[in-house]
């Protein structure tokens, strides 16, 4: 049987795990860990030759290819947004599928056998459109998504594996790159029950990065008179530096942001040099952290518990490593957070545990009881939303309600399904609609039409409408505007497989070209800036000729490019080594100058490569605002007059 893996499909970075020997184990990427400690940056790019790059290779080249690099596609899941890259259009599902395909491939290399199924996590506040889009992405990537579970639930599962016999209530504070989820759970006797969930799909580490970026850009504008926000390449470098500084300041009190040659004007090149302290960082991100408070308070209120009832606080997501975030959560709840769960790995490990239970690799009596995060209902006469399944209802679940016709001799009704907390239909998220037709003509209020909602363990919704008089029925699985048809999914899956084959063939060539371009940048910087006054004319000409030969061979086969690149590297190494030895012999003053030259040779390429794992893109999908009170029950007599639906069919009215 093919392995079932658990995947944390994140906004900035993704992670995956698999159960081995009864325990969840993190799956490494082929390239190893990267910025932030996760294996798979959620970055997709297309090279100038049209080659697909995913994960760390895509992140590394983003600084030189920002227009063809896509980040934070998760924030657009469930929407009709189109990404443009490499001269083509891509849906969010496709971009996410490339990431999942990369994870699948590296997982197979790690476990040494095929991986065909997966449990994928989503933010608790993802609506049905976003969940279905995530499932579609898995299908395109060649994965059978056996279950979609909420990220906080997965984290709780990882936390409770060895404590499942204890009765306790825990609060999971899941603060990721793009979303915030706060979940209150009750655990005991192997049962994990979600009591409530609250959150914000437009709040995350990305917003922190933006605050830091804005500060750096503003500081540089004031000092140098240059607006870096107008230069996409420079802004990408600033974004990476901002994320790096944010991570470093979780463990140190200050850090330096150094970006040489970030810009230039008539006076010459300009360097960005800025010292950022933890105090300044906390000042910048303080308002963002404060926006988490309502979600914590709402989750506690919905679960009908006070902070004193909470036994454990579990922190999930990269931003929760920040001392300011830990201090904030502690001040709101009155409790210190647990340290036994790695915030960057907990979600993937929890997903792997659930995958292991499904595959039979984990012997456990664990029962996972999730909830629906938003109220589900239908549109009725007057544009009023009639709720059927209230938010925080444990799933899987089923609920039905009887409605009637709104006008005499009505022969059809339109069932419009919505998700959200607002009393008016138009203020909620539309999930889809369908018609029940061929109803026998009858006075209004006589027909009895049963509308039934079924939600499976993945949170996917099926809706049925039945005329109880004739037993005629119509049903749908919610088809959102962003959901793909089976034919579209199959085509995209074939495209993904095609990309995989091409990527495998061209991988060596692309990596060699990236390596060559990076070293050319280093060599040019050495002879034009760092060592310009320290090398002989003959040495300068020699390196320039080597650079020219490498540039001319960039688009040629590896067997032509590799020797030229190795030759250039040898030349640069010989010259910088010679200069270092001379400087060392001249004493401390000369040694300092030689060290600078050697450091520039070894490190300049690192400044030019890499891209941030976060994006400031808008969040995809919208959660409805809080309800001002439940919709009142109406008798049949209140269904006065026809009011056509979007397709001209009258809407149902509430039954007496």
Curated annotation (Swiss-Prot):
This protein's record includes keyword Chaperone: yes
UniProt-listed CDD domains: ASKHA_NBD_HSP70_DnaK-like (cd10234)
Compositionally biased spans, kind Low complexity: 606-621
Sequence segments annotated as region (Disordered): 590-656
Gene Ontology MF terms: ATP binding; ATP-dependent protein folding chaperone; unfolded protein binding
InterPro entries for the chain: ATPase_NBD, Chaperone_DnaK, Heat_shock_70_CS, HSP70_C_sf, HSP70_peptide-bd_sf, Hsp_70_fam
Keywords noted in UniProt: ATP-binding, Chaperone, Nucleotide-binding
Main function: Acts as a chaperone.
Family label: Belongs to the heat shock protein 70 family.
Annotated protein name in UniProt: Chaperone protein DnaK
Organism expressing this protein natively: Cenarchaeum symbiosum (strain A)
Primary gene name: dnaK
């Amino acid at each position: 049987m093919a392995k079932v893996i658990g995947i944390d499909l994140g906004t900035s970075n993704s992670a995956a795990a698999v159960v081995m020997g009864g325990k969840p184990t993190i799956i490494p990427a082929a390239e190893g860990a990267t910025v932030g400690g996760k294996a798979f940056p959620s970055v997709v790019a297309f090279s100038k030759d049209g080659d697909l790059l995913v994960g760390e290779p895509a992140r590394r080249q983003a600084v030189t290819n920002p227009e063809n690099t896509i980040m934070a596609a998760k924030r657009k899941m469930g929407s009709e947004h189109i990404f443009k890259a490499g001269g083509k259009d891509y849906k969010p599902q496709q971009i996410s599928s490339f990431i999942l395909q990369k994870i699948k491939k590296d997982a197979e290399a790690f476990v040494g056998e095929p991986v065909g199924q997966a449990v994928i996590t989503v933010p608790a506040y993802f609506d049905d459109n976003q969940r279905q889009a995530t499932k579609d992405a898995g299908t395109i990537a060649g994965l059978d998504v056996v279950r979609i579970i909420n990220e906080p639930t997965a984290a709780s599962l990882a936390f409770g594996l060895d404590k499942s016999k204890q009765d306790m209530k825990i609060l999971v504070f899941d603060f990721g790159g793009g979303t915030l989820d706060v979940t209150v759970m009750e655990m005991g006797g192997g049962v994990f029950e979600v009591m409530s969930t609250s959150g914000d799909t437009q709040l995350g580490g990305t917003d922190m990065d933006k605050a830091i970026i804005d500060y750096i850009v503003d500081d540089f504008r004031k000092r140098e008179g240059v607006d870096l926000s107008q230069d996409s390449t420079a802004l990408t470098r600033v974004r990476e530096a901002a994320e790096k500084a944010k991570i470093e300041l979780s463990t140190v009190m200050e850090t330096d942001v150094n970006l040489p040659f970030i810009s230039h004007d008539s006076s010459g090149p300009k360097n960005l040099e800025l010292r950022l302290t933890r105090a300044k960082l906390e000042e910048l991100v303080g308002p963002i952290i404060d926006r988490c408070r309502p979600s914590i308070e709402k989750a506690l209120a919905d679960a009908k518990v006070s902070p004193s009832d909470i036994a454990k606080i579990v922190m999930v997501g990269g931003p929760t490593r920040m001392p300011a975030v830990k201090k904030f959560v502690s001040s709101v709840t009155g409790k210190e957070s647990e340290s036994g769960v790695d915030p960057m790995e907990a979600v993937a490990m929890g997903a792997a545990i659930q995958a292991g239970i499904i595959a039979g690799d984990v012997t456990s009596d664990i029962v996972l009881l999730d909830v629906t995060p938003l109220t589900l209902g239908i549109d009725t006469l007057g544009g009023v939303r009639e709720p059927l399944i209230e938010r925080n209802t444990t799933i899987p679940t089923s609920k039905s309600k009887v409605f009637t016709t709104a006008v005499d001799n009505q022969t059809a009704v339109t069932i419009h399904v919505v998700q959200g907390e607002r009393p008016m239909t138009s203020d909620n998220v539309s999930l889809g609609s369908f018609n029940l037709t061929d109803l026998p003509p009858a006075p209004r209020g006589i027909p009895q039409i049963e509308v039934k909602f079924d939600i499976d363990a993945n949170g996917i919704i099926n809706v049925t409408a039945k005329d109880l008089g004739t037993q005629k029925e119509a049903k749908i699985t919610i088809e959102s505007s962003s959901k793909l048809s089976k034919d579209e999914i199959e085509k995209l899956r074939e495209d993904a497989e095609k990309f995989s084959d091409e990527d495998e063939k061209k991988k060596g060539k692309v990596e060699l070209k990236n390596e060559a371009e990076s070293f050319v940048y280093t060599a040019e910087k050495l002879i034009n800036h760092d060592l310009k006054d320290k090398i002989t004319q003959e040495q300068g000409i020699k390196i320039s000729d080597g650079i020219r030969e490498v540039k001319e061979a960039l688009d040629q086969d590896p067997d032509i490019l590799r020797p030229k690149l190795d030759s250039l590297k040898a030349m640069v190494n010989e010259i910088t080594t010679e200069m270092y030895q001379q400087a060392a012999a001249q004493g401390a003053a000369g040694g300092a100058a030689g060290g600078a030259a050697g450091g520039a040779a070894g490190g300049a390429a690192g400044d030019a490569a890499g891209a941030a794992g976060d994006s400031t893109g808008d969040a995809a999908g919208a959660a409805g605002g809080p309800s001002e009170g439940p919709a009142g029950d109406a008798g049949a007599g209140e269904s006065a007059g026809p009011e056509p639906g979007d397709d001209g069919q009258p809407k149902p009215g509430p039954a007496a």
